[in-house]
Amino acid sequence: MTSTVGTLGTAITSRVHSLNRPNMVSVGTVVWLSSELMFFAGLFAMYFTARAQAGGKWPPSTELNLYQAVPVTLVLIASSFTCQMGVFSAERGDVFGLRRWYVITLLMGLFFVLGQGYEYYHLITHGTTIPSSAYGSVFYLATGFHGLHVTGGLIAFIFLLARTTMSKFTPAQATASIVVSYYWHFVDIVWIALFTVIYFIR
């Protein structure tokens, strides 16, 4: 009787420990994103330093298209919600739901990248380039590096969708979907900050 109770207690303790043990892939991702946050903090510092040293009108004469930037931004923000719906599906073991929501997120992210590309084209045709001014330099550096991060997220979605299509859905793939969602939420939050600084703080 005592041994049975002891065995049961050990099993329960072992189960609790396994449930509470952090996933090292997720922990590693959070640590990596923290370093990425420091990188973007440096870009923000560069932006405000250039603004302080400009001395004149900031930003200089440019053609930022707020009416185009707002819808593109709203789509990117909405993609965080569709991404999280994919995570919920993965946690339930619903691979079809995961694929559906992640395909939607992928398309929304692609829309954002194309919208940013059009914004670049619009600005360049109106004379706002990297060598044109300090503003042009920090604008393209900050938004360009963010755009590269978004593109990296799209590639991650493609790889994840390919893996879940070509093989049986596994806990490792569910973990991968959660890790990708961390990254995607991160690039969304960074863009909200960039968008606010660039388009509203004058």
Curated annotation (Swiss-Prot):
Catalytic activity: 4 Fe(II)-[cytochrome c] + O2 + 8 H(+)(in) = 4 Fe(III)-[cytochrome c] + 2 H2O + 4 H(+)(out)
Xref: CDD domains: Heme_Cu_Oxidase_III_like
Enzyme Commission designation: 7.1.1.9
GO cellular component, one term: plasma membrane
Official protein name in the record: Probable cytochrome c oxidase subunit 3
Cellular compartments annotated: Cell membrane
One Pfam family, short name: COX3
Entry membrane topology: Multi-pass membrane protein
One biological process term in Gene Ontology: aerobic electron transport chain
SUPFAM superfamilies with a match to the protein in the record: Cytochrome c oxidase subunit III-like (SSF81452)
Main EC class the enzyme belongs to: translocase
Family note: Belongs to the cytochrome c oxidase subunit 3 family.
Signal peptide: none
Entry keywords, A to Z: Cell membrane, Membrane, Translocase, Transmembrane, Transmembrane helix
Transmembrane regions: 30-50, 69-89, 101-121, 141-161, 178-198
InterPro entries referenced in this protein's UniProt entry, alphabetically: Cyt_c/ubiquinol_Oxase_su3 (IPR024791), Cyt_c_oxidase-like_su3 (IPR000298), Cyt_c_oxidase_su3-like_sf (IPR035973), Cyt_c_oxidase_su3_a-hlx (IPR013833)
GO molecular function annotations of the record: cytochrome-c oxidase activity
